[in-house]
A protein has these predicted regions:
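Catalytic-core signal marking the mid-to-C-terminal active-site face
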Residues: 12, 383-452
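Conserved PLP-dependent catalytic core of the aminotransferase class-I/II
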Residues: 339-340, 344-404
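Long amphipathic alpha-helical segments
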Residues: 2-84
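Conserved PLP-enzyme active-site core in the AAT-like
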Residues: 134-350, 475
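Glycine-rich phosphate-binding segment of PLP-dependent enzymes
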Residues: 52, 95-96, 106-132
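Short Gly/Ser/Thr- and Asp/Glu-enriched loop/turn motifs at secondary-structure junctions
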Residues: 19-20, 38, 93-97, 306-309, ...
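Long amphipathic N-terminal alpha/beta scaffold segment
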Residues: 63-109, 116
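PLP-dependent enzyme catalytic core of the Aspartate aminotransferase-like
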Residues: 110, 115, 422-480
Length: 480
């Protein structure tokens, strides 16, 4: 007769028969409290999954008897329920040095935008209702006047992101026609969003002109023909061509296109609405400038330099924007009421440009004085050093950050922060990974970056130091 498996005869191991049935587990008084708090459906479902998992462990001989005790089962079930209810999207502390971080939600919403959003969503609102006439309204009205006032355009519409704005513009103005673009502007942005692929998806034929580094007016003139539906300029926001280069400006290109009866569209990508040079930052093209130069359509993002929610903003002539607004695809790409409310409040802030550097988080962080960041680094260094000792050392260091999200890609922002290095050089990589993981595991996760065998915490975006320092005891405990 075969000898029983060790797990069966080992008295320290639990067997599948030791596990209670789901109904029996749920009848316990401690579980009744869970059901009262969270409802029967959720608790019963998690109890079933818990017992299934424990049963697999028991059959494999890997389940200790302590795990099947009533108190242990209640604790495990409570953990499962709370984990299931925990939000997957969480607030974090961005110490990466990238202000508008694509993976960390891009632009921070300003206080007025958050307040307006909460106030409107607490009850019904006039999203598509005309209060004056009592009839059906148009959600574009919420922001169109603001956009035309700020940019000088005749009309405006909005969709849910700038990729959608570009797709919709091409589809509405050049479907089954040709779109002329310089070879040097056939960009790819994050997520494999390639301009040639967008053209194809919009039902237009791409016509490339010029070369990668030099395109002239004559190249556009020669390419325009009876099948041309659109001439397009694409701002290379996430890379830079330098050296022996040439490009045609919007004003000259508008004259060429309009002389042949063809509209000109410009995709600005990041889309700042204020001259960044006034704040000591490199200048980005403005929608206002593009409109004044004669562009029929200008599109740009809402959640980058503009400092608002994710949105694709389209401004231009009444004729061009009218065609875009009435194109069938527009409804599928329209903004929902939440980001539209936040966008309205953000755009209202631009009516008082003198206050933007104080009130708009994105601009406030980009223009934060270096001396202030350096002082913060010096102040935090002792506390962090004590929390990570004796395995790591901490020093205050100068750093170079960046704007992020494809905005001004070659520019760096002088900053300051804390550099954490392992005391033991052997296994330094693993030690830094462990520290980074411990920071991410904090209740309010801290995200830095590893470079040159150190974990760097750029403090430009840390405005409330208390959010960081109050978690240092937890970090210290995690590193023991």
């Amino acid at each position: 007769m075969a000898r029983p498996a060790e797990s069966v005869v080992d008295g320290s191991k639990a067997q599948a028969k030791d596990l209670p049935a789901v109904d029996r587990l749920l009848r316990g008084p401690a579980i009744a409290a869970l059901v009262a708090e969270h409802g029967h459906t959720l608790v019963a479902g998690e109890a079933r999954l818990l017992l299934d998992g424990l049963r697999v462990q028991a059959l494999a001989g890997a389940l200790g008897r302590a795990a099947v005790q009533p108190a242990a089962l209640v604790g495990a079930l409570d953990d499962r329920v709370r984990t299931r209810l925990a939000s997957r999207m969480r607030r974090v502390i961005n110490l990466t040095g990238t202000v508008i971080h694509t993976n960390l939600g891009r632009a921070l919403l300003a206080g007025p935008a958050l307040e307006h959003l909460l106030a409107l969503m607490a009850g019904p609102n006039n999203l598509e209702y005309d209060l004056a006439s009592g009839g059906r309204g148009d959600r574009d009205v919420v922001v169109e006047e603001l956009l035309t006032t700020i940019t000088g355009a005749q009309a405006a519409t909005v969709v849910n992101n700038n990729a959608a704005a570009v797709l919709l513009t091409i589809a509405a103005l050049a479907r089954r026609k040709e779109v002329i673009v310089s070879r040097g502007e056939l960009v790819e942005i994050g997520g494999a969003f390639r301009m040639p692929d967008v053209m194809a998806a919009a039902g237009a034929k791409l016509v490339e002109v010029g070369t990668t580094n030099r395109t002239h007016a004559r190249d556009y003139s020669a390419a325009i023909g009876p099948r041309t539906g659109l001439v397009m300029k694409v701002h290379a926001s996430n890379y830079a061509l330098q050296g022996f280069t040439a490009a045609v400006g919007e004003a000259e290109l508008a004259r060429i296109a309009h002389a042949r009866g063809v509209p000109l569209a410009s995709d600005l990508g990041s889309g700042s609405l204020v001259d960044l040079a006034a704040y000591g930052l490199p200048r980005e093209p403005l929608p206002q400038d593009q409109i004044a130069a004669g562009c029929d359509v200008v599109s740009f993002s809402g959640d980058k330099l503009l400092g608002g929610p994710q949105a694709g903003l389209i401004v231009g002539t009444k004729e061009a924007v009218g065609r875009i607004r009435t194109f069938p695809l527009k409804r599928a790409l329209r903004m929902s009421k939440l980001p539209l409310a936040a966008l309205e409040a953000t755009l209202r802030m631009y009516l008082r440009p003198e206050l933007l550097a104080r009130d708009l988080p994105t601009l406030r962080l980009l223009t934060r004085p270096l001396a202030e960041i350096e002082a913060l680094a010096a102040a935090l260094q002792p506390a962090l050093a004590a929390a990570v000792a004796p395995r790591y050392t901490v020093e205050s260091v100068p750093l170079l950050g960046q704007i992020g999200s494809g905005s001004l890609p070659v520019e760096r922002l002088p900053s300051a922060g804390l550099a954490i290095g392992p005391v033991q050089k052997k296994g330094a990589g693993r030690a830094l990974d462990a520290l980074a993981a411990a920071l991410r595991a904090l209740p309010l996760p801290v995200i830095g970056r590893i470079a040159e065998d150190r974990l760097l915490l750029d403090l430009r975006c840390l405005e409330d130091a208390g959010l960081f320092t109050t978690q240092l005891p937890l970090l210290q405990e995690a590193l023991r």
